């Protein structure tokens, strides 16, 4: 915690932050205001709530310190040449009432459906053979809360806050990571991020390779100016069995994740469609890939990058219990 000392204006919030971090990193089965207070020896959650809601400290500065602290040991532990991936994902937190900034009825993975809560976009740093860690986060705020001055005031939102999609929030997270010197071989994410043209353009402007999930209806430009959806492209170009190869995309909760994979070149020399097929059901998943000139573009490399996104999906919910707060 000594590295975080400069981000706090007073010693009291710094000491409370140290207690809070120890509780979050503990083996508490459920982490919320009351359980954290009991674990650190506080009589009530007031001190922690004051730290998170009202105390004066540099949030972005703290994120920068933590990001550098988290990335360095993973790089040191990784095998030479192993992939580094920035994995984008969002996670919900259930909330009661309407007083919390960003709260609305929406799809919540932690609730298994539609429920009242907030959504936060996360960026994780994944280093093959070494591990993964969260390095950035931004809360998504619904447009209707930003456009209503009364709601913005009552929930504590800045009156000059501009609406941002989850893809646009991801751009901010990645920009911060790039400024901090975080090097990524690929950026990976699900359909939320693959559908964001601004995010894809940002990554390409920075010569940053990506493997982003897209819907079956995503339109591709193939050779000779042919326009096909992902489904149509697979039906036309991947009929033959020899077009598919069986590869592992890494370990999962039930062992190795092995699928059939294929890829299709587009009219652009730096864009590809990567297709994953379930070996039993035949279900297809599509990834739009960008690999800048001068970087290796191979099927095994793209498959590995796509697979490195999966371990992150449960990180913030399971390990840090971020879906437990009410």
PLM regions and their residue ranges:
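An anionic, glycine-rich sequence signature occurring as long contiguous blocks
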Residues: 128-151, 155, 159, 211-314
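Basic, amphipathic alpha-helical segments enriched in Lys/Arg and hydrophobic/aromatic residues
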Residues: 323-326
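Trp- and S/T/G-rich repeat-edge/linker motifs of beta-rich repeat architectures
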Residues: 317-318
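Conserved, well-structured functional cores that handle cations and Mg-NTP chemistry
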Residues: 1-188, 192-209, 216-219
């Amino acid at each position: 915690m000594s590295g975080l000392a400069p981000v706090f204006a007073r010693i009291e919030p710094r000491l409370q932050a140290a207690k809070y971090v120890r509780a979050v990193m503990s083996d508490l089965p459920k982490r919320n205001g009351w359980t954290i207070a009991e674990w650190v020896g506080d009589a009530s959650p007031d001190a922690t709530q004051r730290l998170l809601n009202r105390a004066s400290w540099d949030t972005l500065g703290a994120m920068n310190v933590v990001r550098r602290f988290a990335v360095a040991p993973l790089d040191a532990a990784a095998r030479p040449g192993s992939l580094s991936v920035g994995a984008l994902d969002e996670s919900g937190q259930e909330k009661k009432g309407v007083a919390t900034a960003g709260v609305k009825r929406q799809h919540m993975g932690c609730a298994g459906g539609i429920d009242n809560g907030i959504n936060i976009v996360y960026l994780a740093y994944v280093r093959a053979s070494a591990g993964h860690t969260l390095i950035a986060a931004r809360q998504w705020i619904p447009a209707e809360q930003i456009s209503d001055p009364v709601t913005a005031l009552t929930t504590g939102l800045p009156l000059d806050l501009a609406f941002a999609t989850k893809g646009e929030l991801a751009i901010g997270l990645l920009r911060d990571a790039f400024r901090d010197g975080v090097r990524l071989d690929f950026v990976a994410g699900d359909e939320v991020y693959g559908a964001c043209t601004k995010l894809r353009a940002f990554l390409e402007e920075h010569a940053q390779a990506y493997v982003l999930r897209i819907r079956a209806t995503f339109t591709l430009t193939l050779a000779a100016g042919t326009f096909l959806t992902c489904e149509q492209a697979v039906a036309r170009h991947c009929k033959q069995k020899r077009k598919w190869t069986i590869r592992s995309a890494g370990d999962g909760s039930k062992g190795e994740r092995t699928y059939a994979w294929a890829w299709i070149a587009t009219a652009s020399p730096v864009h590809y469609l990567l297709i994953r097929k379930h070996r039993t059901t035949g279900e297809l998943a599509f990834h739009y890939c960008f690999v800048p000139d001068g970087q290796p573009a191979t099927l095994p490399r793209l498959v590995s990058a796509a697979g490195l996104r999966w371990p992150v999906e449960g990180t913030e919910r399971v390990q840090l219990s971020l879906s437990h707060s009410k």
